[in-house]
Amino acid sequence: MVLENKTFDEERALYGSSGITVRNCRFDGPQDGESALKESKEITVENSFFNLRYPFWHDDYLSIKNCELTELCRAALWYTGHADISDSKLHGIKALRECHDINISGCSIVSPEFGWSVNNASFVNSSAESEYFMMRSSNLKFENFRLNGKYSFQYVENMEMANCDLNTKDAFWHSKNVTVRDSVINGEYLAWYSDHLTLINCTIKGTQPFCYCTNLKLINCKMIDTDLAFEKSEVEAEITTEIDSIKNPKRGKITLPRAKELIITEDCSQCEIIQAELTTA
């Protein structure tokens, strides 16, 4: 069944639907009804406008294309699985939570607290403005993705990122098994308490990165305007730029052209720091 060029504003307007296509429709109006497509399955939604709360809860096998979910469309997708979302605006707070098997491409996300406790999700050619983005989520992939917002990727597990641009703060805290390639990360206090974080061909900017880390690896990375790095961390790092300062690394090996300052106030004998410019001088 195809529903086309209609407006819905009543409570649970299409509750429990199965196998329908919604095209060029509006979910808006004076009745201000919630949960339009709750408990639905095998749904396709195209070129539609959502200005009401909680439209996609407990859904399964959902396709959303060229749609706008406004800032009044709060908590749009919760407890939903197998959803493909493309070329859409997700602009309501807490737009994605407790979901699984989600694919997002070509989307604009403006949504604080987006993506909490999500399992198995991919993001391609998309952008987000969000605080606490993807907290406690797992099995994630990001490619050609741009983020603006504090406290991102905290407590995430099993994540891969490539060609991303992250402007953030306190990112990757307590994360586990994360690999980031060919990306720029701009933000202070990066990746504290992380475990098995690997960065390859990345640029890192900001004060006090990588403190209290375990199994941290940096391969062919630039560190710009970074000071007080690696405090209390277990690290294997190959850095191609000089660092403002390194402080009390716990264990491992750090290779770099030069550190402007080494702050060693504790026993750091288990961490080797090789400064190439000093070695060849």
Where are these regions (language model features)?
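Long, distal/terminal scaffolding or interaction modules
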Residues: 1-281
